[in-house]
Regions:
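Oxyanion/phosphate-interacting regions
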Residues: 1-39, 71, 194-198, 206, ...
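Acidic beta-strand-loop-alpha-helix segment within the catalytic core
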Residues: 113, 117-214, 266-294
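Short glycine-aspartate micro-motif
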Residues: 94-96, 130, 225
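Short, highly selective alpha-helical patches that border small-molecule cofactor pockets
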Residues: 56, 60, 188-193, 238
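An acidic- and aromatic-residue-enriched active-site/binding cleft used to recognize and process polar
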Residues: 81, 100, 135-136, 230
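Short, contiguous strand/loop micro-motifs
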Residues: 50-51, 179, 200-201, 224-226
């Protein structure tokens, strides 16, 4: 692909990303206001704690229409089985979408933690652009070649985001991990129970996770994200934020060695045994040591 053509395609990607986040926010909120989208559609592959409901289809339908409208050659991988989106011919790009992060909460009537996330990758599987929409607050997180940004649509503002520089696990850190499901919570506490007894009194455990969390890492809201058995479908749509921010996102082996996490097309239903995302290498290494030596 020639340079000018590449710029043109990247511009289309950026446009689709903003259109998607804007339209998905509006349509999901509209359906939520009517109490729609709670019909159960099925289970999620390798995710006994999760379920697919009607609201999950909204984002997928919007994105499919947009990529076809802009005549993009792309394949986008989604969380539910058989819901990948293909447009055009041989893909020039790949995508990963989490159409609605907060399904279980929405189904149970909680107006809390509703997000949608979307990332695009080049043919070499490198992140090009990522976006997260905070549906309830009408805020959009964007990661592109210019950096990471937060757009507050109600206030009409756009600010640049920067990560934390915390390096010491014994300090006043903010660690995110998904604790709402017992199967994940047990593994986290198995690794961190002893350390937690000596946590700094102002240490904060943010009990949420998923594809949106990487925008929080890029914004300095959290210092690290730790997950055991993390589904790739919860990483791919958002981890580009962390990479753009210079944060570390690694998959950890049983012996403590690790590799940079990489998007792999078609593997969204696989899991990572231990995923650590941290704002600094020093904090990453301390977390890995704690997990391996548990």
């Amino acid at each position: 692909m020639c340079f000018n053509k590449k710029l043109e395609k990247n511009s289309v990607i950026a446009k689709i990303l903003m259109e998607y986040l804007t339209e998905a926010t509006r349509e999901i909120q509209r359906k939520a206001d009517k109490g729609e989208g709670k019909e159960i559609l099925g289970e999620v592959i390798n995710r006994p704690e999760d379920i697919e409901i009607g609201i999950d289809r909204v984002g997928e339908d919007i994105l499919e229409r947009l990529v076809k409208k802009h005549k993009l050659n792309i394949k986008v991988y989604s969380e539910p089985d058989g819901r990948d989106i293909e447009a055009g011919g041989e893909p020039d790009f790949y995508g990963a979408i989490d159409p609605f992060d907060g399904t279980v909460l929405y189904l149970r009537g909680f107006e809390h933690n509703w997000y949608t996330a979307l990332s695009f990758f080049d043919k070499d599987k490198k992140p090009l652009a990522s976006g997260v929409a905070d549906i309830l607050r009408d805020k959009i997180y964007i990661s592109d070649e210019n950096g990471n940004f937060l757009i507050d649509r109600r206030a009409g503002t756009k600010i640049r985001l920067f990560p934390s520089q915390k390096k010491d696990l014994s300090g006043q850190v903010v660690i995110a991990t998904y604790l709402m499901s017992p199967r994940y919570a047990i593994k986290f506490w198995d690794a961190f129970a002893e350390l937690a007894k000596n946590f700094h009194p102002k240490t904060l455990l943010y009990p949420q996770g998923g594809s949106f969390i990487y925008s929080f890492l890029a914004a300095g809201l959290i210092d690290a994200y730790v997950m055991f058995d993390e589904p790739r479908s919860e990483i791919d749509p958002g981890y580009g934020f962390a990479r753009k921010a210079g944060c570390s996102v690694v998959s950890v082996n049983p012996d403590g060695s690790f590799e940079d996490y990489q998007f792999e097309p078609g593997r969204q239903h696989d899991k990572v045994d231990l995923l650590v995302a941290a704002c600094t290498p020093e904090l990453r290494d301390q977390i890995i040591k704690q997990c391996v030596e548990k």
